[in-house]
Amino acid sequence: MQINVVKTFLFALAASSVSALAVDTEFRCGAPEPSEELIEASAIMAVAEAEAAANGTLAARQSALTIDTYVHVVATSTSASAGYLSDATIQQQLRVMNEDYAPSGIQFVLKGTDRTVNANWARDSGETAMKTALRKGTYKDLNLYFLSSIPGGILGYCYFPASATTSTVRLDGCTIASGTVPGGSISRFNLGKTAVHEVGHWFGLYHTFQGGCNGQGDLVDDTPAQASASSGCPIGRDSCPNQPGLDPIHNYMDYSDDSCYEEFTPGQNARMSSMFAQFRAGK
């Protein structure tokens, strides 16, 4: 969303209530609210990115990243219908992620896969116990947990970056419904894009509709204002007609159908690099 504001305003925003940037989980994503720490970091980064965009150096803020990735398949049984994903399906999912993140300079390298049959964990009950048992790597490594189902119709959720403490590292990663993988059982959302969306949160991106038409939105300057989440692929939607640009329905951080997703913006690319450098690199 456009954030043509001065530094002093952004720093004031960073100190304001987190509730103004609460993440909408109604449709498909259960990501938690961004913390005050993250909002403050986003505001500071937004200033630097706006200055870089103005002088033509925004692309230089984007870094090439290779992310070690661990996949945990947690299902109610060993049947494919229960979400017990095959190696081939996992490779397809990683291929989608690598294709979609390639313009951002980000690639994911599969370092390990494990499979667990646990009826409670597979329905997203006992998250802390599950992640304590299964999580691998450090805070800079991505852990993906594919579950048979997530309550409330949620397709996935992921934790934003934060200062690396024992608890934040333990819970870190993305939890995703197995039916969203390529060829999965959830129609409209079975091209593997839910993982792309959720990993965007892992890199510190908010939803494009954050804050609606009049708030400060996702604190990324080149994502147009958006009143609410998209559904389907509503070409030409303009939910904030008094703000520049049409709704970013093709952006991975909206709620469009998988077939509608196409891009991250240059500002989002720079933000992901900045967030990784501040919160995850070397952790």
From Swiss-Prot:
Gene3D superfamilies: Collagenase (Catalytic Domain)
InterPro entries: MetalloPept_cat_dom_sf, Peptidase_M43
Matching SUPFAM superfamilies: Metalloproteases ('zincins'), catalytic domain
Chain positions carrying an annotated carbohydrate: 55
Gene Ontology cellular-component annotations: extracellular region
Gene Ontology terms, MF aspect: metal ion binding; metallopeptidase activity
Signal peptide extent: 1-22
Protein name according to UniProt: Extracellular metalloprotease MGG_08041
